[in-house]
Every structure is written in structure tokens, then in C-alpha cells.
Curated annotation (Swiss-Prot):
Localization annotation: Cytoplasm
Cited NCBIfam families: baf, PRK13318.1-5, PRK13318.1-6, PRK13321.1
A GO cellular component annotation in the UniProt record: cytoplasm
Protein name: Type III pantothenate kinase
Encoding gene per record: coaX
Enzyme nomenclature, EC number: 2.7.1.33
Length: 268
């Protein structure tokens, strides 16, 4: 089985794949202060709680936007699985032609999402990822990564409002029934949630115009708060909560032959 690991600024999501089918997945908090031993114990416990054996993992692929965590995490995986994990970056085959001024600047998570979205839904398309940052990525009909937009995530905006405005409380990210609100809490919730709906609709519509194509441009959303925003807009066609994990599985398969050769050599 293949373990795929998506390291984000807020959460680490792990998925276990067998023959490209998701067997199980787990979500843990990203913590740069955790040691490799702590990560090793935590990951092993996740497997045990699910009735799985970590020793069934043949190989591991990681996508990360948090460089400071990689030493501890990679060391933990080497210890648990006895493999050197494949890390998405330069030299890893993705099948995506990146049309960025500096391709190295594109976050691994954005590339992984693009791979999965184009494979599953074709192009042209826009991928919106509601993570710590909200990212919008444009992929052409030929599977080229054209570029995109990065904006503060919904939770970042909510936390900033609480931290910078002395009289405003921290609020739960839920959708109030209207925008003419009668309390401070519901007023903040309406501003955050419906404000983000407006942001998403505007950027998606502007991106579609910049594509300058006649064919339909599909919009695929992923990330923890994608369902919340999707419930208030018509501009999202598909919500795919496992998009990043599937992208990692696909990228692994595109590098499988080379990986198998490396693993065989290391075991010789």
C-alpha cells in the first residue's frame, strides 16, 4: 500500500491507498515543534486505531508547503516504513506543464490539485482550494498550469478581525440566514462567509474571461470549508474533498517505475 501525505500550514492529511483506491485517511494538526519520535508514535497510533499495520506500507509520497516540518516528518517515516519518501518537487514527474514565470515558486499543493483535477475532470478548469490560504488555479484544456490567485483563507480573515478589533469576539464559521443581522456575532459571520462568497464568484468570473475560450470551464473546489461556500454560490461545479490525496496517488503512479527501481536497489 502507498501512504500519501499532504502537509499544509494548518493540518497534515494522510491517506492510505491500495491499487489507487483510498483505504483510509487521517487528519492531524501541523506542529513544527513536534519531534520525529512524536510524529512516529502519532502516525503509528493512527494505523493501530484503524486496525491497520504500518508495515503494509510499501512506499510514501509527500507534498508539503511547510519546509520546517520536513526533517522531523521524513525521519519519522523512514523509521516507520523503512523507505526514503518521495517528495513532490523538482525532478518528480507530474505530467503538468507549468506556465509560471518561475515554476519553482508554485506550491506543491497547487500542482498536486491540478494533476488530480485535470485527470478526473479534464480542462479547461479552475481549482479553488479553501485551505489556510484560498488559492485559485487555472488549468488549460491541454493540462497546462496557467497560473492563479492566492488570497487569505477564511479562518485567517476571521482570526485577524478578532485580533485587530478590540471589541469584536472570535466567532464560529457558520452561515447566518441573512446579511441584515441583529447581533455582533451574526454580523461578523455574515461578513466573513458572504464576503468570501463574493470573493470566490468575482475571481472565478474574472478568470473565466481571461481564459478567452468558448468551451465550458469547470470549477472544482476542495479544502475544509469548500462545502460551506458551495452552499451559497452557483459558480462551483464540483466539491472534491479528496482531490489533493488523489493527486498524490496519481503522481506516485507516474513515478512508480523509478521508485520501484530505487527501492529494489536499496534493498539489495
Amino acid at each position: 500500500m502507498i501512504l500519501v501525505v499532504d502537509v499544509g500550514n494548518t493540518n497534515i492529511v494522510l491517506g492510505l491507498y491500495e491499487k489507487q483506491e483510498l483505504v483510509d485517511f487521517w487528519r492531524i494538526s501541523t506542529d513544527e515543534d513536534k519531534s520525529s519520535d512524536e510524529y512516529s508514535v502519532l502516525i503509528n497510533q493512527l494505523f493501530q486505531y484503524s486496525g491497520l499495520n504500518i508495515k503494509t506500507v510499501e512506499d510514501v509520497i509527500i507534498s508539503s508547503v511547510v519546509p520546517n516540518i520536513m526533517y522531523s516528518l521524513e525521519h519519522a517515516i523512514r523509521k516507520l516504513c523503512n523507505v526514503e519518501p518521495l517528495v513532490v518537487g523538482p525532478g518528480v514527474k507530474t505530467g503538468i506543464n507549468i506556465k509560471y514565470d518561475n515554476p519553482k515558486q508554485v506550491g506543491a499543493d497547487r500542482i498536486v490539485n491540478a494533476v488530480a483535477a485535470f485527470e478526473k475532470y479534464g480542462g479547461p478548469l479552475i481549482v479553488v482550494d479553501f485551505g489556510t490560504a484560498t488559492t485559485f488555479c487555472a488549468i488549460s484544456g491541454h493540462g497546462e498550469y496557467l497560473g492563479g490567485t492566492i488570497s487569505p483563507g477564511i479562518k485567517i480573515a476571521s482570526d485577524a478581525l478578532f485580533q485587530r478589533a478590540a471589541k469584536l469576539p472570535r466567532v464560529e464559521l457558520v452561515k447566518p440566514g441573512k446579511v441584515i443581522c441583529k447581533s455582533t456575532v451574526s454580523s461578523m459571520q455574515a461578513g466573513i462567509v458572504y464576503g468570501y462568497v463574493g470573493l470566490v464568484e468575482y475571481i472565478v468570473n474574472k478568470m473565466k474571461k481571461e481564459f478567452n475560450v468558448r468551451s465550458k470551464i469547470k470549477v472544482v473546489a476542495t479544502g475544509g470549508l469548500s462545502t460551506l461556500i458551495d452552499s451559497e454560490t452557483q459558480c462551483i461545479d464540483v466539491v472534491d474533498k479528496f482531490l489533493t490525496l488523489e493527486g498524490l496517488s496519481l503522481i506516485y503512479e507516474r513515478n512508480r517505475q523509478e521508485r520501484q527501481a530505487i527501492l529494489k536497489e536499496s534493498q539489495a
